[in-house]
Amino acid sequence: MLITVSGPAGSGKSTLAKSLADALNYEHVSGGDIFRSLAEERGMTPLELNKAAEEDDQIDRDLDRKLRDIAAERDDLVLESRLAGWMAGEYADMKLWLTAPLDVRADRIATRENKPFEQAKTETRERGDSEAQRYSDYYDIDFDDLSIYDLSVNTARWDPQGVLSVTLHAVESYSPDGDEGKAPVENIRYEF
């Protein structure tokens, strides 16, 4: 089974994806880790690399191509990135969307990255706006369109174990025999 975990920065994607992969004994691949490594290799912060990606679309396209290739080639995998559900498309068996209010996400990022809350909030908002515009420009994706996801979870409502419990129940309850049709991922320009 290929499970995708998507959502905005600070929504808990990495926390859930790692826990879910461990619970299911699946492999875990993180687009965020790949992106942060790219930023570090270039001597940039993720926000700076996001800004550079506004001018150089190949940065996003290389990452997204890699995610789509991984989705096409692997099974028993939790694939995590902002666009994992979109990039995995028809290859995904279950697409999860995580979210939380901006202040909650900014607080998580401030704690994780040891920076002031207001700075984290501003950067998180700017990063989200930058990414949403690029996703629209490159692939005609509306990042706010959640219709492709099988389950959406507000991670501010539960602690990480609770989020895992909710999503693990959904995954373990899934049966291809009872599946009347997953939400299609249509009209995406997979032009890498």
From Swiss-Prot:
It catalyses: CMP + ATP = CDP + ADP; dCMP + ATP = dCDP + ADP. GO terms for cellular component: cytoplasm. InterPro entries: Cyt_kin_arch (IPR011892), Cytidylate_kinase_dom (IPR011994), P-loop_NTPase (IPR027417). It holds the Pfam family Cytidylate_kin2. GO terms for molecular function: ATP binding; CMP kinase activity; dCMP kinase activity. ATP binds at residues 7-15. Keywords: ATP-binding, Cytoplasm, Kinase, Nucleotide-binding, Transferase. Its EC number is 2.7.4.25. One of its GO terms (biological process) is pyrimidine nucleotide metabolic process. It is found in: Cytoplasm. NCBIfam families: cyt_kin_arch (TIGR02173). Belongs to the cytidylate kinase family. Type 2 subfamily. This is Cytidylate kinase. It comes from Haloarcula marismortui (strain ATCC 43049 / DSM 3752 / JCM 8966 / VKM B-1809). The gene is cmk.
